[in-house]
Amino acid sequence: GAFACVQHGLRRIEEGLTVVPEVRTTLLKAYVDQSPTDYDPEQVSQYAIAYAHEAADPFLRRVYYGAGLMKLNAADVGAQEVYEKSLGYGMLFADVKPYTHRERRKKDKIRIGYISGDFRQHVMQYFVWPFLAGYDANVFEVYVYSLGKSDQYTDFFKTLVTKWRDLSAHARDMERIAREIHADEVDILFDLAGHTAGTGLAALAWKPAPVQLSGLGYMATTGLPAVDYFVTDHCCDPEGSGSEAFYVEKLLRLTSQFCYNGYTHLPRSTGTPARGRGYIQFASFNQYQKLRDPVLRAWQEIMERVP
């Protein structure tokens, strides 16, 4: 199968990896990006985590482990297993010496920092937009730590915040990023990416801010003890569901659902094309790797039920 082919290919390039270690990352990403209909995501998760333990480079170690956790969320495993595997991510930082915060530094305003690689055309923008646009500037200062590529949406986000730090050139050096955040005297640091691609989650291991949160971009525990809170809502983690047992963080449930804000410049609707065609047209604009047999079966049932 596909998994066996990748294993064979990786064995053949082991010698070359000592010269070009990034090849392993490229191959792993190519495999992770395939649809779960082509392979067992739990196997890929185990494979990535095994590579994490082998990697000498701390950055690659965290990348591999994070990729393994991402894939585990696509596997048919329970929340307990995801939680237990996530704890291993936190153990990768056992030798990190975190900053201490004995008392709040004296500033006129509360300083909030957001860190992510997705301040661009990305689904995350629709959820973070209200946070960046709706804060009270008399009470808060907002700092953004951007680790990814820039586009026209990035330019717009820059107009909303107090300070914009483009740290994309240092995305492999999480200790340096943590040092810069600490130097900015951020009071609350919010990681928006979790274990998704281009994340800055690892910087939180150094505890650069006295209060640290994660959420929005990844809907499971980070496994990182330095993260104090996980932002969720009553739909993803209902009260009384027992979700707290599967997080190292304390859950912060929004009083409403997630603060989604779509485009404001879309053209006005002229009505559904289905009225003219006589049938409904379905589409999905998700990443291919999210497709699984249960999803395809659900789509099949929808198509069979709709005239």
Give a label for each model feature.
Residues 292, 298-299:
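Integrase module of LTR retroelements
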Residues 139-141, 300-307:
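A conserved nucleotide-sugar
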Residues 1-279, 287, 297:
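Alpha-helical solenoid repeat scaffolds of the TPR/TPR-like class and their adjacent stem/linker regions
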